[in-house]
Regions:
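Generic structural signal for well-ordered alpha-helical scaffold segments
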Residues: 22, 76, 80, 106-107
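Glycine-rich phosphate-binding segment of PLP-dependent enzymes
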Residues: 43-62, 76, 81
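PLP-dependent class I/II
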Residues: 2, 6, 10-12, 17, ...
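Conserved N-terminal alpha-helix of the aminotransferase class I/II PLP-enzyme fold
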Residues: 62-95
Length: 394
């Protein structure tokens, strides 16, 4: 009964674990959740007011499928001001979240058998979306001892005549890694050499620490920009995950037109009032965003300090987003709380059932020796949860 293309697609473990954790809390379990990939802050008041006012002004009807012109213009201005990228409103598609933008891209650019380079560890939906579009994910393992740096020799070996695109995610979910300008430039050069499209997921661009700055790979040259599709959105930066507004930009009119056509036959336009709210979001002072980023940085420092105190766990310092990706391989093969730890699913199940802590198993991101912790939660929760993890792993 089910289409073959969906039989090879697994469910989102991150959403599944978050749903289970929320149900346990609803059932009265004293649970600490590190699974959710969304800010725990409220949407800023000015943005909420813009959405409310849009509804009161009856901004409740269809818009063009690719988004309202005013929001496209605001996105184009954002790219120019913040990323040094010149796009026309006609180069931009507004979608129902950055995840939707990515889905649209793969559906638009992939033919059966086309390969897509995905750096591993990777965000859970990249590989599944590529498979839905009848593409083939090709994984390139990042070098953990070198802070999840790219192995360019390995990358070159993975590129074939079937390779159509590569995905660049900076800052990274799940590792928090931020590739250097030199690494991004090398990636851009390789993409030009092999005539590959670059899908650049920049959704966490404003959540960067240690004084580092975000660089869009599309900004290196006109040639690189011409082969890059930039994806972003308002969800993570402005605590608007439920508003469902993402966007993409590309110089390639054929790709943009194809995505516009696809979206017109699937979701049509994103919700009208949330598009209006997104315009206000893009006008929000940087000080508001920086206040949230500063709080995330404090939590990042705390979670690293607490992990430092748990023997057997190691990690690479995250420089962006709000995740950390501890390596627990020293526990593999051991029995903890009556459960043999063969991989990350075993560890996550043990922590959930015995310690009442929800984490995301690393296998969801292509790395079975790790688990992901989101520090988009309170300092008190971080301390409470790490107390429980430390006790469980004694």
């Amino acid at each position: 009964m089910i289409a073959e293309r969906l039989k090879k697609v697994g469910p989102s473990l991150t959403l599944a674990i978050d749903a289970k954790a929320k149900q346990m809390i609803k059932d009265g379990v004293d649970l600490v959740g590190f699974g959710v990939g969304e800010p725990d802050f409220n949407t800023p008041e000015n943005i909420k007011e813009a959405g409310i006012n849009a509804i009161k002004a009856n901004k409740t009807r269809y818009t063009p499928a690719s988004g309202i012109p005013e929001l496209k213009a605001a996105v184009a201005e954002k790219f120019k001001k913040e990323n040094g990228l010149e796009y026309k409103p006609s180069d931009i598609i507004i979608s129902c979240g950055a995840k939707h933008s990515l889905y649209n891209i793969f559906m638009a650019i992939l033919n059966p058998g086309n390969e897509v380079i995905i750096f591993s560890p990777y965000w859970v939906s990249y590989a599944e979306q590529v498979k839905i579009a009848d593409g083939v994910p090709v994984f390139v393992q990042l070098d953990e001892p070198r802070n999840f740096e790219i192995d360019f020799n390995l990358l070159e070996k993975k590129i074939t005549k079937k390779t159509k695109a590569m995905i660049v995610n900076s800052p990274s979910n799940p590792t928090g890694a931020v590739p250097s300008a030199d690494s991004l430039k090398k990636l851009a050069d390789i993409a030009l050499k092999h005539k590959l499209l670059i899908v650049s997921d920049e959704i966490y661009e404003k959540l960067i620490y240690n004084g580092k700055k975000h660089i869009s790979i599309a900004s290196f040259s006109k040639e690189v920009k011409a082969q890059t599709i930039v994806v972003n959105g308002v969800s993570k930066t402005y605590a608007m995950t439920g508003w469902r507004i993402g966007y993409l930009a590309s110089d390639n009119k054929e790709i943009v037109s194809a995505i516009d056509n696809l979206q017109s036959h699937s979701t049509s336009n994103p919700a009208t009032m949330t598009q209006v709210a997104a315009i206000e979001a893009l006008k929000t002072p940087d000080s508001v965003v920086q206040a949230m980023a500063s709080e995330f940085d404090k939590r990042r420092q705390l979670i690293m300090k607490r992990l430092d105190g748990i023997p057997g766990l190691t990690y690479v310092e995250p420089e962006g987003a709000f995740y950390i990706f501890p390596n627990f391989s020293s526990f593999t093969g051991k029995t903890i709380k009556g459960r043999k730890i063969k991989g990350s699913l075993d560890l996550a199940e043990m922590l959930l059932n015995e310690a009442k802590v929800a984490v995301v198993p690393g296998i969801a991101f292509g790395s079975d020796n790790h688990f992901r912790l989101s520090y988009a939660t309170s300092m008190a929760n971080i301390d409470k949860g790490l107390d429980r993890i430390a006790e469980a792993l004694k």
